[in-house]
Amino acid sequence: MAQPVQSIDVLLIEHAELELALADPELHSNPAEARKAGRRFARLAPIVATHRKLISARDDLQTARELAAGDESFADEIAELESRIAELTTQLTDMLAPHDPHGPDDIVLEVKSGEGGEESALFAADLARMYIRYAERHGWTVTVLDETTSDLGGYKDATLAISHKGASDGDAVDGVWSRMKFEGGVHRVQRVPVTESQGRVHTSAAGVLVYPEPEEIGEVHIDESDLRIDVYRSSGKGGQGVNTTDSAVRITHLPTGVVVTCQNERSQLQNKTRALQVLAARLQAMAEEQALANASADRASQIRTVDRSERIRTYNFPENRITDHRIGYKAHNLDQVLDGDLDALFDALSAADKQSRLQQV
């Protein structure tokens, strides 16, 4: 959910207050609050830095104009400073536009096969591999938390955790969620299935769900009494002895009926921890969607149309074409896209989202 636009003066005051708070040892007696304050301070830092550059450039421009009155050689410097001020003003306006508070977050991504049997499951596996390859290109970490395979090695369903922590290109603003949040929805494929003997093109689909992962489970209230936790023997690739111990964990959130399973970690405790993280992400997403619906049914409908609509994208193998129906994006490089070359598409989706946010300023 986007946050309302704030004035630079309000943010400058908040930044100064956070700087003082972070220097106070008392804050660090509560590690969770200290981390929360640190994350907010890091998010405000680029805004404050850009504002300071803008003020400095304006002061320099005023000085250059005064000097130019007696020396025409300063005319070129005036033009350069005016261009610099326009650039910084645009940057600051963008930073102050309504933003997604989950932008820096990691994600939990689920891929589910739909109608189409084995072909749909194979396509779901193609999508999972596409996202894994994209993450690898950016130095992100991917953990397969759970998977159910089909007879031909496709995915009936799979759950991935994708994290940018420690990545060379990671920063406080542009996280995994900011890049991949538009992937939720129905993905359609048109190709000749491996099971097709007549060479006919078939259409099938797979679904993708994407959730921002809370920095800490404690950010989402989960009552232990609302949970049913079952353990069973893992069938995944968790490590030695995985098929001889009850290491897999299934957690059911009784009030909502949400079920989360995790079996690919090496121990029952690790699987439980990861399952709780996934549950927290899903409950957070549900709560925010409900709050959005309560605030504005019309706006909620638009959000669902953009983010979770039927057939958000088509992958046409005979024509090597990918089409994103939400923004009219088309490209004839499907083979590269499926190998994780998604930045051009994600840039186009982000640009459309940015334009929408700027219209709210």
UniProtKB/Swiss-Prot annotation:
Main location: cytoplasm
Post-translational modification: Methylated by PrmC. Methylation increases the termination efficiency of RF1.
Sites bearing N5-methylglutamine, chain numbering: 240
GO molecular function, one term: translation release factor activity, codon specific
Keywords of this entry: Cytoplasm, Methylation, Protein biosynthesis
Subcellular location: Cytoplasm
Alphabetical list of Pfam families matching this protein: PCRF, RF-1
Listed InterPro entries: PCRF, Pep_chain_release_fac_I, Pep_chain_release_fac_I_sf, Prokaryotic/Mito_RF, RF-1
Protein's UniProt keywords contain Zinc: no
Cysteine pairings via disulfide bonds: none
GO CC terms, sorted: cytoplasm
General function of this protein: Peptide chain release factor 1 directs the termination of translation in response to the peptide chain termination codons UAG and UAA.
HAMAP family the UniProt entry points to: Rel_fac_1 (MF_00093)
Family: Belongs to the prokaryotic/mitochondrial release factor family.
Protein name: Peptide chain release factor 1
